[in-house]
Regions:
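N-terminal juxtadomain amphipathic helix
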Residues: 2-81
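Extended interfacial segments that mediate partner engagement and assembly in macromolecular machines
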Residues: 43-48, 55-129, 136, 141
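Local beta-strand N-terminus motif with an aromatic residue
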Residues: 98, 154-155
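Conserved short alpha-helix immediately C-terminal to the canonical SAM/SAH-binding motif I
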Residues: 130-132, 172
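Short conserved loop adjoining the S-adenosyl-L-methionine
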Residues: 146-152
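A conserved beta-strand element that flanks and buttresses the S-adenosyl-L-methionine
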Residues: 158
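A short His-aromatic
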Residues: 161-165
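A short glycine-rich, Lys/Arg-flanked "PGG" loop and its adjoining helix->strand segment in the class I
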Residues: 170-184
């Protein structure tokens, strides 16, 4: 289904604000079979790849987040490689002895459950559409931005396979810093 979508168009490199050069353009199904709806009902979007002089490849046309993440798809939950990833990342996190963790984009809860099996931690997940909520985790339904925390602070902020989905990485990192105890 082709539908007009109000895309955000990058004019400069998201990392260093330099000019972008066209690489390629193609049409693609937005949800690519990651949801249960029929592929014929998928949204067809134009994917335009651009590159900066420094070699940073990025999408030029950005789908509005409320459309892109309207449904959860629990990526990163199936298979032994993902299970090992969450176990190893949990072991890494536990080494810093966290007490109050914010996980950004951890809708499936695998990382939280691995960490909570190892230590007593207050764990909060911010996720736009978490479907299977664990009772031992605090959930904030929405996209990450500092205003949703009402001045709450965390001693640790984690995210796994989330950064590549962030449209404004500088702003994202600044906002993470603002919710960390001591300002990061």
């Amino acid at each position: 289904m082709i539908r007009d979508i109000n895309l955000t168009k990058r004019q400069k490199c998201v990392i260093d604000n330099t000019e972008l050069e066209f690489l390629s353009r193609d049409s693609f199904p937005l949800f690519c079979g990651c949801v249960e709806s029929d592929l014929k009902d998928d949204l067809i979007c134009e994917q335009e790849w651009v590159v900066s002089k420094e070699g940073v490849i990025q999408l030029k046309n950005l789908i509005p987040l409320e459309i892109l993440y309207a449904n959860g798809h629990d990526a990163g939950t199936v298979g032994s490689l993902w299970e090992e990833h969450h176990r190893e990342f949990a072991n890494f996190i536990i080494k810093s002895d966290p007490k109050n963790v914010l996980e950004i984009g951890g809708g499936h809860g695998k990382l939280s459950q691995n960490c909570l099996s190892l230590a007593d931690i207050k764990w909060t997940i911010v996720e736009p559409n978490s479907e299977n909520k664990h009772k031992n985790v605090d959930y904030i339904d929405g996209f990450f931005h500092k205003e949703i925390f009402n001045n709450r602070c965390f001693d640790t902020v984690v995210h796994s396979h989330t950064f590549e989905h962030i449209y404004n990485p500088h702003e994202f990192l600044e906002e993470i810093s603002s919710v960390l105890m001591g300002g990061g």
